[in-house]
Design a protein with these regions (language model features):
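Contiguous, structured surface segment used for ligand recognition
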Residues: 1-85
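An acidic- and aromatic-residue-enriched active-site/binding cleft used to recognize and process polar
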Residues: 38-40, 98, 126, 133-136, ...
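An acidic-aromatic substrate-binding cleft motif
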Residues: 58-128, 307-310
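Hydrophobic faces of well-ordered beta-strands that scaffold small-molecule active sites
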Residues: 91-95, 122, 128-131, 151-154, ...
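Catalytic domains of carbohydrate-active enzymes, especially glycoside hydrolases
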Residues: 109-139, 143-152, 195
Length: 324
């Protein structure tokens, strides 16, 4: 029994056990409840397991308007509960095009909807999030990290940095002429996040989620070879910037849209240690999404592709033709 009743109740003890795998837990229920875990997320998952199994709090309780009844006590049989082993190391949600979240307040608190979203992710066994797009990602980043989540970034936001056009208003986003300004943006972003758990997104795309050559007026990137070479060199530079501040960093790159097309044709070089994240087209088909009048439909499934792999699967996006 545990609760606020007059019955003799259990205490919940937390026991750090370095022999357990990361994020795993063991719950021993006897005279007391002993939760063993190797790290913070292991303890979080265990407490949420108790919440669901014995207090009947559903993972989506907030979003489903679950009516929660107060209980004086809960009786639990003696048992042992061991955590399931996740098949994917980094698992999470990307909160994108989040217009319905941006002005929502709960009891006057703009942070509470995001807090509930991150809690739900944890209750579902997730451990990573892109905590919004553009400004929202930076507003919500620390809260997500404080709740134990890994942070990663929008595929058009290298290392989670500020958008060039906002950081340098009136300055053309021309990498060949303004490379030092880009480097400063990226370095500032790394310094800002270096104390969080981050899967660092490596990329170079244009302003506002488009190919970088759409914003470039130099005329130097008129072939896929030139475009791929620049992106490859920038990815290496971004890795070097992160390694200045972070020990054993985790890297990913999103092979999305025009980036997948260049990669498939062999124009972009990516080290095997970088997680290559492949995307569906918005309809569940693993091909590149359509944009404007461009319908390449390049397969995004790995073919003899070495190294670490990931998937970016859309739930409420239907490509950039239907979206228009």
């Amino acid at each position: 029994v545990f609760g606020a009743s007059d019955e003799n109740g259990n205490d919940i003890h937390l026991k750090k056990d370095d022999t357990l795998d990361e994020e795993s837990y063991k719950i021993d229920i006897a005279e007391n409840i002993v939760i063993s875990a190797a790290d913070d997320l292991g303890f979080v998952y265990a407490l949420l397991k108790i919440s669901e199994k014995y207090l009947d709090i559903k993972p989506f309780w907030f979003w489903f308007d679950q009516k929660i009844e107060k209980k004086d006590s809960v009786k639990i049989e003696k048992c042992e509960i061991n955590s399931p082993k996740p098949k994917v190391k980094y698992r999470g949600w990307f909160f994108n095009d989040e217009v319905l979240m941006m002005k929502w307040k709960i009891n006057g608190d703009k942070k509470e909807p995001w807090r509930m979203a991150f809690e739900t992710l944890l209750r579902c066994g997730g451990n990573m999030t892109i905590p919004g797009t553009d400004k929202n990602s930076r507003l919500n980043r620390q809260m997500a990290a404080d709740m134990g989540l890994w942070i990663t970034h929008h595929h058009a936001e290298p290392l989670g940095a500020e958008i060039f056009a906002r950081a340098y208003p009136g300055v053309e986003a021309n990498f060949m002429e303004k490379s030092e300004l880009f480097y400063k943006l990226w370095e500032d972003a790394v310094i800002e996040q270096k104390d969080c758990n981050v899967v660092w997104n490596l990329c170079f795309r244009g302003q506002g989620d488009c190919p970088f050559w759409s914003n470039d007026t130099s005329g130097q990137f008129d072939t896929p070879q030139k475009r791929g070479k620049l992106i490859s060199n920038i990815i290496k530079k971004q890795c070097d910037i992160v390694k200045k501040y972070v020990k054993n960093p985790v890297f990913c790159t999103n092979l999305y849209g025009e980036i997948m097309e260049l990669y498939k044709d062999g124009y972009i070089e990516i080290d095997d240690g970088i997680i290559k994240v492949k995307a569906d087209n918005g309809y569940g088909k693993m091909v590149t999404r359509r944009r404007d009048n461009h319908t390449a439909r390049v397969s995004s499934m790995p073919v003899k592709d070495g190294g670490r792999q990931g998937i970016y699967y859309h739930v409420s996006f239907y490509d950039l033709q239907a979206a228009n």
